[in-house]
């Protein structure tokens, strides 16, 4: 089984148990803490991926680092991953868990690029419009891209909405080139 499929299955199992046993908020907070530590520790990631470190040692490492930081149920889960020789999947399980939780809550991510910084009001209007258009809650990541000249581009999943001046100029250029003289 591929690691992506396994990660999704573990994440789904954790999500279902957390919902059923009513500790979803705790697990979500715990996984954010774990993700923060993992993203800041290359050595820990290497240890989790290393075939030279045995299951018991990986479990002890995880217990030592996270034992006092996360809840008992979350600790049981990450030790289970270690004992199943899947500790290397922990970062992707956390990512999949977040994606599944977003799906459940009707949240989608949008990458918004603009030529100039949007005011709070403009950003709020844009997010509300996207929310109405998609029927979902929008988590927008705003960034600047001066190449756009003006306007905005929005990427949601595989869909790109391009309202930039750069794009309009490209369309105009294409239509002028395509017209016979």
Curated annotation (Swiss-Prot):
Keyword Translocase tagged: no
Family: Belongs to the ATPase delta chain family.
Keywords, ordered alphabetically: ATP synthesis, Cell inner membrane, Cell membrane, CF(1), Hydrogen ion transport, Ion transport, Membrane, Transport
NCBIfam families xref list: ATP_synt_delta
GO terms of molecular function: proton-transporting ATP synthase activity, rotational mechanism
The protein's name: ATP synthase subunit delta
HAMAP family for this protein: ATP_synth_delta_bact
SUPFAM superfamilies: N-terminal domain of the delta subunit of the F1F0-ATP synthase
Pfam families: OSCP
Role according to the record: F(1)F(0) ATP synthase produces ATP from ADP in the presence of a proton or sodium gradient. F-type ATPases consist of two structural domains, F(1) containing the extramembraneous catalytic core and F(0) containing the membrane proton channel, linked together by a central stalk and a peripheral stalk. During catalysis, ATP synthesis in the catalytic domain of F(1) is coupled via a rotary mechanism of the central stalk subunits to proton translocation. This protein is part of the stalk that links CF(0) to CF(1). It either transmits conformational changes from CF(0) to CF(1) or is implicated in proton conduction.
One of the record's GO cellular component terms: proton-transporting ATP synthase complex
Chief location of this protein within or outside the cell: membrane
Membrane topology qualifier: Peripheral membrane protein
């Amino acid at each position: 089984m591929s690691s992506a499929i396994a990660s999704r299955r573990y994440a789904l199992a954790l999500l279902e148990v957390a919902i059923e046993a009513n500790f979803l908020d705790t697990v979500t907070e715990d996984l954010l803490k774990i993700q923060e530590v993992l993203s800041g520790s290359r050595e820990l990631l290497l240890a989790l991926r290393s075939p030279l470190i045995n299951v018991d040692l990986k479990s002890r490492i995880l217990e030592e680092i996270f034992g006092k930081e996360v809840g008992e149920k979350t600790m049981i889960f990450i030790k289970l991953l270690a004992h199943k020789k899947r500790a290397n999947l922990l970062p992707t399980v956390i990512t999949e868990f977040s994606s599944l939780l977003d799906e459940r809550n009707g949240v989608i991510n949008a990458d918004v690029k603009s030529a100039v910084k949007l005011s709070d009001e403009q950003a709020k209007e844009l997010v509300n419009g996207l929310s109405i258009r998609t029927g979902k809650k929008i988590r927008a990541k705003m960034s600047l891209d001066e190449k756009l000249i003006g306007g905005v581009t929005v990427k949601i999943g595989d869909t790109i909405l391009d309202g930039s001046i750069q794009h309009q100029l490209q369309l105009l250029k294409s239509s002028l080139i395509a017209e016979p003289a």
